[in-house]
């Protein structure tokens, strides 16, 4: 009897410890759980920062930025070697076409004018991906990965969408939507850089 009580207590303690470890490995951002460490195509990445994108008073999505090592400036993020990920989880339903247009405008507002002609093929592909989705619903996630040797991989609900976009300039242009000189949301920029 005493042995089964000890065994039961040990099992409960192990379960509690495992639950604590699992919760310690995540960050809660507006009810969305983001892992502090992830694996992207064989590369170990850590959460650099995460926050919420607001439009007026409305929460639109959470965003998380993953890198191989911490970076505190946009320049450090763009120059960081290896794989990178931006993860977006919707906090409200949104027309996917509208989101695609906002991303395109964000790229235009934050990219050097002499780079825009190089970015057009990637922007057209991204617009096509969002057009096919029609609607992104609350809780749905998409990721934008930079994988050296492959390119930018956009996944919606965990499913890669088409072939990678090879040019790193395209991934950098997308990152500048949030970290550029005219970011989508200044507070989100600071959060992604780990400043909040």
Give residue ranges: language-model regions.
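Flexible glycine-rich active-site/ligand-binding loops centered on an Asp-His dyad
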Residues: 163-188
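N-terminal signal peptide c-region/cleavage motif recognized by signal peptidases
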Residues: 19-22
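N-terminal secretory signal peptides
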Residues: 25-80
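Cysteine/selenocysteine-centered motifs that mediate thiol-based redox chemistry or coordinate metal-sulfur cofactors
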Residues: 186-196
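Bacterial N-terminal signal peptides that target proteins for export
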Residues: 2-11
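Short strand-turn-strand beta-turns centered on an Asx-Gly dipeptide
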Residues: 156-159
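Mid-length scaffold segments of soluble, non-membrane domains
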Residues: 71-149
